[in-house]
C-alpha cells in the first residue's frame, strides 16, 4: 500500500503543472494580434481576408483590420468600397492608426483623381512619424499626385523614396526618375532652383544635361554615361543605371545599306503606296525637281467629282485589307526608278514647282510599272539638297540599295521570304493594317519600320510603328488640349467606325494624362447638318461618356453573389463643365458644325474649339476663314509652313491633294526613321524634327508625332500658341 503522505506530495507537485496547462490552453483559445505584421507591410493579403478578420475582431484589432481592408481595396481598384469602409472608421484612434488614416485619406483622393485635395492632405502629414513602409507609400502618393508631369516636387519625392525600396521596386523608381528628367525640355530644366545640399538631385541634373548635349550621338552618349558614373559613384542612378541608359550602352547601329520597301502598288490602296514611295525616294536620292506625278491624273482629280471618294477623304488606317490586284501586277520586287516611262508624262495643266533657292528635302522621280523599272542610278549633277533643321540630321544616300515589293500582288509571308532571301538589312512597311497584323504573326527577325499599327501593339525589339492615322492625330490633340489647361473635353465625331476609333484613342490618351471623363456627340451626314441649320436647332455642348474614359467600377460581392456597380449617368450637360470641343469633320461638315455650336450656345460660350486636319484641305477661302474664327486645328509641320520647298514639291506631285501630300511627307520621314532605326529603338528621348511632326518613340517604339497647331484669326491663319 502506498503511503498517504506520498499521494499528497504527488498531488501537490502535479497541481502547478495542471494549472499551467490550463493557463496555456486558455491562451490558445485567443488568437494573438496578427495585424502588426500586416500594418508594417511584412505580410500581405487580399481585402476578403481582412474583411473576414475585421468581422471576427473587436476594439483596436478590429480597427487595424479595417484600415488594412481599406488599403487592400484601394490596391484592388475597388475605390468606392474603400471610401465606404473609410467613412465607417471609429472616431477614437491611437496615434499609429491616425497616421494610417491620414495616409489612406490622401491615397483615396488620388484614386478619385482629386489631385489638389490629395496634395493638401499630404502636406499635413509628418513623415517622421511614419513607419518605413508608410513613408514609401507617402512618397508614392506624392509622385502620383504630380500625375507624371516633370517637376521639382516629383523629382524630390522619387529621390526620397528610393532608399526605402529594394529590388524591382528600386529599379522602377530609378527608371521613373529618369523618365521625368528625360521628358523635360532644356528650358524646364534650367528653370529648376535646388538647394546646395541636394547632392543626389544635382547628380541627376548633371546626367540630364549630359544627355541634352549628346542624345543625338550614341557614341558620345555612351562615353558621357561612363564619365558621369565616375564623377557621381554614390548616386543611385550610377549604382543602378536607368534601363533606357543600359540600352544606350549596348547600342549598335543597324545597317541601312539594303532597304526593302513594302507597299501596295495596285488596287484601291495603290495611290497611297505610290505617294509614300515617291516621298521615300525623294529623301533617299537627293534629287531636286519633281519629274512627274505620283498618282494618275484621274485619281488626283477625284476630289472634284460628285459621288466619288477622293483620296483626301480616306485615311490610310481605313484600308485594312488588300484589294484584288489589277492587270500587270508586280510579282517580283522592282528596283527604284529614276526616269518615268513615256506613258506617264504629267498632263499639260499640271503646274511645275517653282524653283527654290535651297530645297529643304530632295525630290525623287515617280514610281513606274514593273515592266519599265530600271536600276537606280545617280547622275553627277544631282546634288543632295539641304535637310530640315532637326535634332538629328538625315542625309541623302543614293548609293543605298532599295527594292520595292508589292504587297497587293502576293501574300505577305511570301514577300517577307523574298525580302529575307534578297538580304535586306531593314524593312520599311507594310502599309495596310491587315498586313501589319500578318507581320506580327510571322515573327520575322528583320528590323521593320511598319507604316501602320496593329490593334494591339506588341513590344518587339526589331519593330517600330509609324502611322499617319486619325487615331494618332487624336492622341496628339488630347495632349495639346490638356497642355492648354482644359479639363472637360467634348468630341464631335462622325456617326461611323472612324468616329468611334478617334474617340477611343483620344479618351485613352486623356486618361493617361490624368484627365477625367471624355464626352462624345456623334453627327450624321451633311444633309442632316444642313437640315439642322435650316431648322435653327444648333448643337448643344452635351454628350455621352466615351467608355474608354470611364473609371472601372467594381461590383460588390455579398454571400458569393456579385452585384454590379450602378451605371454612370450617361448624359452630362455642358452647363459650364465642357471647356473644349474637338471636331473631326471635313471642310463641308465643319462649315455647318461651327455655326450650329454658336447658334445654340452663343459666340461667348467659353468653350475653345479644336479640329483635326481632316477639316483642312487647302481650300479655305476668305469667307471660310472668317467663319472659322477662333478655331484651332492640327496640321503636319510641312503643310503648316515649316518646310515650304518640300510643301510645294509634294503638292505639285499630288495635284494639291492635301491628304496625299501628308503621305508624301510620311515617305520622307520614313527614310529618316529607317536611317535612325536603332536610335529610335534604343536611345531614350531620341527625336527627329520631321515633316509629319516632331517624332519620338514610346517604349514599344510607337512613333509619336507632335503636330503643329494653327488658328483662324480675323481671316488669317496663324500659329495657335
Swiss-Prot record:
Keywords from the named record: Cell outer membrane, Cell shape, Lipoprotein, Membrane, Palmitate, Peptidoglycan synthesis, Signal
Biased composition (Low complexity): 331-393
Residue span of region Disordered: 316-393
N-palmitoyl cysteine-type lipidated residues: 27
GO MF terms, alphabetically ordered: enzyme regulator activity
Signal peptide location: 1-26
Gene Ontology terms describing biological process: peptidoglycan biosynthetic process; regulation of cell shape
Superkingdom assignment: Bacteria
UniProt key word Protein transport: no
Membrane topology: Lipid-anchor
Coiled coil location: none
UniProt biased composition (Polar residues): 316-330
Function: Regulator of peptidoglycan synthesis that is essential for the function of penicillin-binding protein 1A (PBP1a).
HAMAP family given in the database record: LpoA
UniProt similarity note: Belongs to the LpoA family.
Name by which UniProt lists this protein: Penicillin-binding protein activator LpoA
Natural source organism: Enterobacter sp. (strain 638)
